[in-house]
Amino acid sequence: MEESSLSRAPSRGGVNFLNVARTYIPNTKVECHYTLPPGTVPSASDWIGIFKVEAACVRDYHTFVWSLVPESVTDGSPIHASVQFQASYLPKPGAQLYQFRYVNRQGRVCGQSPPFQFREPRPMDELVTLEETDGGSDILLVVPKATVLQNQLDESQQERNDLMQLKLQLEGQVTELKSQVQELEKALAAARQEHAELAEQYKGLSRSHGELTEERDILSRQQGDHVARILELEEDIQTISEKVLMKEVELDRVRDSVKALTREQEKLLGQLKEVQADKEQSEAELQMAQQENRRLNLELQEAKDRQEEQSAQAQRLKDKVAQMKDTLGQVQQRVAELEPLKEQLRGAQELAASSQQKAALLGEELASAAGARDRTIAELHRSRLEVAGVNGRLAELSLHLKEEKSQWSKERAGLLQSVEAEKDKILKLSAEILRLEKAVQEEKTQSQVFKTELAREKDSSLVQLSESKRELTELRSALRVLQKEKEQLQEEKQELLEYMRKLEARLEKVADEKWSEDPATEDEEAAVGLSCPAALTDSEDESPEDMRLPPYSLCESGDSGSSPATGPREASPLVVISQPAPIAPQLSGPAEDSSSDSEAEDEKSVLMAAVQSGGEEANLLLPELGSAFYDMASGFAVGPLTEASTGGPATPPWKECPICKERFPVHTQTHTYTHTHTHA
């Protein structure tokens, strides 16, 4: 029906058209297979049209169909699809070239096919020439294309059955793979659920780990603050200790000075007692010393002024202590000067007054020194209390710090252990998750490979099935064409038979006239008619299958002793009927046409006898056939007639088939050649 071109079309936009034939028969639907490249997104607005080759615009299409959008599209793999053009929309047969074009929704041509034609099959297309080499000799066989197509149809049917079995096996494998995929999906779902649970646990552990880390950071900061506070307290304690030491040193100095002053006071008291004793002794001299006493009162007034000045300078106690020492030295000097005044009353009274004044001053200074000492002692006591409080607080803080350190160490050790345990668990879970992910990935890869292989096998099966269907359609169309031609041949055959009957009637009239003129010739022709193949008409009518003559061969063996009884008419010239092999029975084949073929052969035999007996009568009877048929018929008989007329060697008038023992005239080589091949 059509000759397929398995080469793929060159693609301008990536779309490849597969199995595009060079010719298509009209009035039969056309199936178009194409492949979209990876990355192409098919749309329901895309369409495939049949265009003329010279068409320059997408609107110049003859017909089109919308493209089919696949249900499942795999990323990274080509998409195979097919569409069908109905027979009523196809172009009319002719020499015009067409091609498929894929147009996307933007109106851009994404691919085109090789050109093809729509035409009816020609009569010469129904014959196929086969060349075979057998035993070193080339044999050229010309057989009907229907036989070849029938063989191809049988092979396609067998291949289709094999493909169906393979499809069933693949469907079984697909079912098994689907069950395996479902099991793997269930396992994957369980693994994902377990992975989700592990992820939740991991998140919980991560949150707890984060909280513990934050607590650890807070404790670390608190520890740093406590350590800084402890360092500050230690520095404060060190400073206070230094201050306490300084105060103690200063207190020791004050105590030493107080002791010295106390000793001096005792000395002064002893001197005062001595002075009082001297005073009692010098009362007599008191009057003499009144004037000196007035002067001493003035000095006392001056001393009071100085006392006021010293009270103003009470805050500068430390400086006045030195002045007191100087004053005490002066007092001592003055006391030392009092001894010579014992003799002199005035000097003694003056010294007594001054001593009293100085004693009062010293008493006040001692009182202020005692107050300062008490204040210093109170401050020292307060400092000691502060130091004791600070030490107690420091001890408490140190104890609390030690407790916090021990507790923090314990918590840190526990946290480290828990973190290590969680890390181990996380590592184990990560390894398990990686293993599961790897297994799932491998299963996905295998399932993807299986799906790809199944899709490829399915596509190839669909393509082969569509090819088989297309070839089957072609074969059916060819068979319909053959049936039509067979009907035409039958009609022509019927016309030829009618024409042969008319010729037979004319030949019978001519033969009657000729036989009435020459009885001897009539008897001879009757004898020859009994022995020639035309006498086998009855047997051929009884068995029409024997009239199917296969290709020619030569029967070399003959039996000369099996000839019938000879008579006086044997020496007369023989009328040889050359009977070529019929062509119509080989082409038609059915057994019910054999009877009509045998009748046609009888008519041809009579016609050939008439032609060989006289060319003029044949020309009168067959004006339509002309001289060509006469030359062909007379050519078969010229050889035997020439040999008989030249008086060659005597040969038996009959030949016998070694298989069926059927007898033939010696000179009918063509019929013998044809008959022998019926047994081959």
Swiss-Prot record:
Q: Where is it mostly found?
A: cytoplasm
UBZ1-type zinc finger positions in the chain? 654-679
- Residue ranges for the region (N-terminal AD (CTNNB1 binding site)) are 1-190
Q: Which GO terms describe its biological process?
A: positive regulation of transcription by RNA polymerase II; Wnt signaling pathway
Region (C-terminal AD (CTNNB1 binding site)), start-end ranges: 501-680
Domain comment from the record reads as follows:
The C-terminal activation region (AD) is used for downstream signaling. Seems to be essential for coactivator function with nuclear receptors and with the aryl hydrocarbon receptor. The N-terminal activation region (AD) is necessary and sufficient for synergistic activation of LEF1-mediated transcription by CTNNB1. Contains a EP3000 binding region which is important for synergistic cooperation.
Name of the molecule in the record: Calcium-binding and coiled-coil domain-containing protein 1
Which source organism does the UniProt entry give? Bos taurus (Bovine)
